[in-house]
Amino acid sequence: MALPARSDSGCAVPVEFTSAEQAAAHIGANSLQDGPIGRVGLEIEAHCFDLSNPTRRPSWDELSAVIADVPPLPGGSRITVEPGGAVELSGPPYDGPLAAVAALQADRAVLRAEFARRNLGLVLLGTDPLRPTRRVNPGARYSAMEQFFTASGTAEAGAAMMTATASVQVNLDAGPRDGWAERVRLAHALGPTMIAITANSPMLGGQFTGWCSTRQRVWGQLDSARCGPVLGVDGDDPASEWARYALRAPVMLVNSPDAVPVTNWVPFADWADGRAVLGGRRPTEADLDYHLTTLFPPVRPRRWLEIRYLDSVPDALWPAAVFTLTTLLDDPVAAESAAEATRPVATAWDRAARMGLTDRHLHTAALTCVRLAAERAPAELEESMTLLMRSVQQRRSPADDFSDRVVARGIAAAVRELAKGEL
């Protein structure tokens, strides 16, 4: 998410689109990359807390100073800071989930140690349970996003999304072209079940919300043209459906050094067709490519598949969650069984976020999915898979464990314990 606004550079004059049809062709040609499956890239976001005062939000300068002193990360992850000060590790692609998990674990250990040296802790929860929303990242992109959400009547949800949510993102190869439709359909169909399994955000701003995944609830409060699922009724041509989705979505900002916000509703298609003029011109390929980074569907085509619907979950569980999702998509036998198991709940996004595994249909699907992964898990992930399987068997999401901790100790104490790594 932490991408800078950029403008076209070089001596050549950028070529502007002359129609939405031309823009659609550009999207379709670059949405998914034909090739084998097997590579896995992981990203994990963690809320940053002051160990002495969990109600205080560390400043941008403070976070920047800590990150500047982080030694080279052994797994090659990139460190970025989210709008509200959450710290993200973005790992490069590795061959298979085990290598990707091991690399991210190593990088997270180095990062946590440096933050702990500054009396700061990194907490894996889907939402910040304690502090009010507030932006600390001064980037022009995020200022423009704030203004867009305010103008569109979603200021509260927009602020929560930007400054109080965190996730584990799984990036997988798109695979061979002839399997794109089935693969993208399954990535969507797994969403509600995986949300129920990993739901880890029962609180926001100091209050229980009544939802297991408040993070997913926040995304649902934003406009579906920007944050809803990409696939339509059939899902037979994901590249074309992504193009339609992107062209219908409103432009959030004009891609310029100042990241000028667009505060009226202008679908990208209208800009490309000339029905609306932004920045005194029609859009270029750079404008379109940047527009795509402002769209946040649960499964986003980026030549690969960026799967965005998992809550940030504890260190003991996220390796198993990552392995489960990857296995259900990359192992053909597991994929076939998972598609059948999740069919009854394939569109139950809100129900999964609200009820988690207490919903019997989601629980049934979750049991099948986790068992499929556990049967294929390597010895290195046995402990994490055992914990995840036990949690699912007991119809408990990580949100239940955190809620119990809050009830027993209070919010601030519970957060402090997690920030210190006390389980």
From Swiss-Prot:
EC class (word): ligase
Any one of the GO BP annotations: glutathione biosynthetic process
Enzymatic reactions: L-cysteine + L-glutamate + ATP = gamma-L-glutamyl-L-cysteine + ADP + phosphate + H(+)
InterPro entries the UniProt entry points to: EgtA_Actinobacteria (IPR017809), GCL_bact_plant (IPR035434), GCS2 (IPR006336), Gln_synth/guanido_kin_cat_dom (IPR014746)
GO molecular function: ATP binding; glutamate-cysteine ligase activity
A Pfam match: GCS2
Pathway(s): Amino-acid biosynthesis; ergothioneine biosynthesis
Keyword terms of this UniProt record: ATP-binding, Ligase, Nucleotide-binding
E.C. numbers: 6.3.2.2
Gene3D superfamilies: 3.30.590.20
Family: Belongs to the glutamate--cysteine ligase type 2 family. EgtA subfamily.
Described purpose of this protein according to its UniProt entry: Catalyzes the synthesis of gamma-glutamylcysteine (gamma-GC). This compound is used as substrate for the biosynthesis of the low-molecular thiol compound ergothioneine.
NCBIfam families the record matches: EgtA_Cys_ligase
Stated name of the protein: Glutamate--cysteine ligase EgtA
The species this protein was found in: Mycolicibacterium smegmatis (strain ATCC 700084 / mc(2)155)
